[in-house]
Amino acid sequence: MKYFDKIAKVYDSWYTTKTGSYVDKTEKELVLSLLKIKKGFSLDLGCGTGNYTLELHKKGFEVIGLDSSKEMLRVARKKVPEIFFINGDAYFLPFKDQVFNLVVSITMFEFIKEPTKVMKEIYRVLKPGGEVLIGTMNGRSLWFLFKRIKSLFVETAYRYARFYTPKELKNLCQKAGFKNIETRGIIFFPSFFPFTQLAFKLDRKLNRIFKNFGAFVVVRAEK
């Protein structure tokens, strides 16, 4: 997507803000807590600037990052030069069958037109017993509503995005043949909310009570 080539150099700047830092930390905590596989060969699908590629590398995984944006990959390679990054297509993954123990894809599915096709490719490249984690914006959250309205007036990535509910993500996994499917959601306040320490604490409490209603939803499944 050309839009991501255009914003690649400034993409990570949001994570340096107070809200961005909190969101990034909270989302990563959730994703990493859901991992049952602790080592092996992993693919960060739609890796962008390599944020999750780096996290998987730190956890001891052998990891490859794949993205369709050459400019995002240029940033990723500078950030983590020791990791192999590929400019590729999620619809036609350039790997043999049953290669990976783990596939992680964070905020990529919002921007693909044929999610069923991509899920089949993920299933194909995973080893038996391998797992997939997909993180997207939740289509039923306050955060989604704010992002969608904002994109009508200011060009953002979310103007081109499709948002999923936990049920839709489960259905995608089931159709592809995955089993042991679970979903979790986090981040309840929209991004314009003043994230004070009190708000952080309240948000974390809500995360524990309402596991599928946060702005960011993750589905985990096994082959």
Per-range role (PLM):
Residues 104:
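A conserved beta-strand element that flanks and buttresses the S-adenosyl-L-methionine
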Residues 107-111:
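Short catalytic micro-motifs in class I SAM-dependent methyltransferases
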Residues 43, 49-92:
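Class I SAM-dependent methyltransferase SAM/SAH-binding core
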Residues 1-37, 51, 55, 131-155, 193-196, ...:
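Conserved class I S-adenosyl-L-methionine
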Residues 147, 171, 180-223:
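A C-terminal cap/extension of S-adenosyl-L-methionine-dependent methyltransferases
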Residues 151-168:
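Acceptor-substrate binding/catalytic loop of class I
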Residues 116-128:
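A short glycine-rich, Lys/Arg-flanked "PGG" loop and its adjoining helix->strand segment in the class I
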